[in-house]
Structure formats: structure tokens, C-alpha cells
């Protein structure tokens, strides 16, 4: 039998996070980029260009520098021949997440990627976010998401309510059904509100790998 999830503690309780600067600390001003090392640089570069609508800043047989915003590069792909696949049980980064401005943009992106034969392996409402998970050609997980609440404080209040402790995974959903409801005019607040777990279902039953 699976063990029960350990209740999470929210250090910021219901007030929302306090930035390091407000706390009088010197901290990074932003997260700059991430780097993938791969033996299939061209394929990986094209995948990230497609998924993120990124453009190539600089590219040759050794590397690709990509960006989708004002940063000089958000993603770097390094060519390293002969690499072995990362074992599923290896320690390391689980996934990297990208936030969209609204549900319409997220659903449009899902449809655009589906036409490019890039489909999510996991669609889930975590509570704080509505999320689509994808795997790049090397099997690394990428999350495309929206925030379900309008502010960090609202998210913190929801998490402090105990709802996240009850279900720290979320509720899976059918993306095409979600699109149908969205196009029929169901309010976004209702579409992104996380429903309760079905009777007799564990949070761990919602995991997709």
C-alpha cells in the first residue's frame, strides 16, 4: 500500500511569498537559462524551437542558443556525442516549467503542438496550476502551465487551506474536453478550479509517467 503523503508546510502561510530583496537579502534578479547536453543537437533544437516558439540566436554543429523573449538565450543545446540516456531512477531535475499568460494561450499551444505531432503525456490540474507535460527527444520533461489564481497570495491562501495536503498531485483531465468547455463559454475560473478526488481514488492514481 502506498504511504500517505506527508502534509506540506507553507512557510508563507496565507500572506504570499516575500521576496529576498524585501527581506533585505541580495538574490538573483532572474532565472537566466537552462542547458541541455545531447547527442542529437539538431533534433533537440528544432523541438524546443517548436514548443517554445523560440528563435535561434546562434547555432553551429556544437551548440544552439535559443530564446523566445528579451533574453539573449533562454535555452542552450550542447552537442556531446556518445551520451547515454538518463536512467529513469536517476537523481536530478524532474522537469522545467513555462508559464503562459492565460488559458486561451495554453490551449492554443496544445492544439498547435498536436498538429506538429507533439502531444502531452500528462494533463493535470495541480490546484495552483493547470499543466501539460511533454517530453523532449531525450526524454526530459517540460511543463507548460498557467497559474489558476490571480496572485501569489491567492495561491498561498489556497495551499494554506489544506487542500494541497489532501491531494498534492492533482486531478488529470482530458484536454480536448477542456477545450470544448472553454469554447462553449464556461468561465475560466470554473474551468481551472480543481475538482475533488473521485471516491476511492488516491492522489498517486493521478500520476502519469
Predicted regions and their residues:
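Conserved short beta-strand elements that form part of the metal-binding/catalytic scaffold
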Residues: 55-90, 135, 141-149
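Eukaryotic phosphotyrosine signaling hubs
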Residues: 31-33, 91-96
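N-terminal "first-domain core" detector
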Residues: 15-16, 22-65, 69
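Generic hydrophobic, aliphatic-rich segments that mediate packing or membrane embedding
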Residues: 89-92, 109
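Short acidic N-proximal helix/loop "leader" segments that mark the beginning
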Residues: 1-28, 184
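Alpha-helix termination/capping residues and helix-transition junctions
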Residues: 25-28, 90, 115-117, 136
Amino acid at each position: 500500500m502506498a504511504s500517505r503523503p506527508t502534509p506540506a508546510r507553507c512557510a508563507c502561510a496565507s500572506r504570499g511569498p516575500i521576496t529576498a530583496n524585501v527581506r533585505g537579502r541580495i538574490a538573483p534578479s532572474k532565472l537566466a537559462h537552462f542547458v541541455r547536453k545531447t547527442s542529437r543537437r539538431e533534433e533537440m533544437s528544432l523541438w524546443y524551437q517548436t514548443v517554445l516558439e523560440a528563435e535561434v540566436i546562434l547555432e553551429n554543429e556544437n551548440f544552439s542558443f535559443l530564446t523566445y523573449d528579451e533574453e539573449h538565450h533562454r535555452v542552450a543545446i550542447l552537442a556531446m556525442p556518445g551520451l547515454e540516456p538518463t536512467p529513469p531512477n536517476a537523481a536530478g531535475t524532474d522537469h522545467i516549467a513555462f508559464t503562459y499568460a492565460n488559458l486561451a494561450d495554453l490551449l492554443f499551444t496544445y492544439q498547435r503542438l498536436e498538429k506538429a505531432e507533439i502531444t502531452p503525456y500528462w494533463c493535470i490540474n495541480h490546484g495552483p496550476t493547470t499543466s501539460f507535460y511533454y517530453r523532449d527527444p531525450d526524454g526530459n520533461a517540460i511543463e507548460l502551465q498557467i497559474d489558476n489564481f490571480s496572485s501569489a497570495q491567492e495561491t498561498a491562501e489556497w495551499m494554506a487551506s489544506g487542500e494541497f495536503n489532501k491531494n498534492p498531485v492533482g486531478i488529470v483531465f482530458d484536454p480536448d474536453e477542456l477545450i470544448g468547455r472553454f469554447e462553449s463559454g464556461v468561465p475560466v475560473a470554473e474551468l481551472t478550479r480543481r475538482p475533488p478526488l473521485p471516491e476511492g481514488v488516491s492522489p498517486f492514481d493521478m500520476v502519469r509517467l
